[in-house]
Amino acid sequence: VNSVENQQLNFPVTRRTLLVTGGAGFIGANFVHHWCTVYPEDRVIVLDALTYAGNRSNLADWEGKENFQFIQGDICDRSLVDQILQTEAIDTIAHFAAESHVDRSILGPAAFVQTNVIGTFTLLEAFLQHWRARGQPDNYRFLHVSTDEVYGSLTTDDPPFTEKTPYAPNSPYSASKAGSDHLVRAYYHTYKLPTIITNCSNNYGPYQFPEKLIPLMCINCLLGKQLPVYGDGQNIRDWLYVGDHCTALDLVIHQGLPGETYNIGGNNEVKNIDLVQMLCQLMDELAVDLPVRPSQELITFVQDRLGHDRRYAIDASKIATQLGWTPAVTVTEGLRRTVEWYLMHRSWWKPLLSKQYQEYYDKVYLTQK
């Protein structure tokens, strides 16, 4: 157990009742695992619409436990949100629910505006009313989990994004997240609602839906399918292991200041092609049943994503200095853990490779202009 995790166990004992939106999704489910493990006395209510990327089985470890409850529903449903806040006496919202895949946002932006902007607005309105009705308690928190993509794209020479970097989103996805960030910030400045925003870099780890880069490559290796790499493969991303992200969010809820924004990054800038080659080497080492070996032979360059941001990089010195958080898992260790998880959990991802997923995959990677 690292020092930050030890530190968390010593937080003053104030029981929290959390509403975790999108808790059946990738980051949300990992956060629920973290919170229920570290704070078993707290109550956790998950609200998730169970869209294609939400999977109730991600939360199987907690189903039936006294302090855990799952509710299927939409964050845009104001009466449902009101009912949950009042009935369950929620004091903390951890807001993960979002449409999050850039390629899908290019194919169909409407769902992104609806969930990410209107959904966040609905939660803010409901939580503001609830907070006021309870006498505006100091310990209430609205944590809005967002992305570094709101800052736009960097050249290889630019300094990393800080919390002061101006917003310049380039995709319908990042524009919708930027819109939601602005609403959250406005509710703090206008109404003093105790909101906090976090902007993270690319997450990876267990329970990530197969459309995302790292699980996509692992699964395609196992199926002997091409490993599609956009453009020239030189796009750079900063990779954050999801467990490290959850530790940071824990600290932000307990010690972060309302009205503040915290950037959360892994300090792991890697070119896409280098990442794919690292994954190929891990698959060759760890998987016994590869149809094609070496896996690197499957790498196929495909037409670049529309408006593909060249580089993301996060300066996470604020959260390091103010809250004492730094990432504990190196990209080498994190990738190994992740590959091992996908190899051991085929029964988790195989049902997700549905006809709809295949149609979407073909549309993105095989329809070359």
Protein language model features and the residues they cover:
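Proline-centered turn/helix-capping motifs that create local helix->coil transitions or kinks
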Residues: 132, 143, 150-156, 192, ...
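Generic alpha-helical secondary structure signal
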Residues: 54, 92, 146, 182, ...
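Short aromatic-enriched loop/helix-cap "lid" or pocket-rim segments at secondary-structure transitions
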Residues: 56-59, 154-157, 208-211, 275-277, ...
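C-terminal substrate-binding subdomain of Rossmann-fold SDR/epimerase-dehydratase oxidoreductases
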Residues: 3-4, 10-11, 18, 31, ...
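N-terminal Rossmann-like NAD(P)+-binding domain of SDR-like oxidoreductases, especially those catalyzing
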Residues: 1-203, 337, 345, 351-369
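The catalytic Tyr-centered alpha-helix of NAD(P)H-dependent dehydrogenases
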Residues: 158, 169-176, 206, 210-214, ...
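Short histidine/acidic/glycine/proline-rich micro-motifs that form metal-
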Residues: 50, 202-205, 235-236, 305-306
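Residue-level recognition of oxygen-bearing side chains
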Residues: 80, 111, 118, 209-213, ...
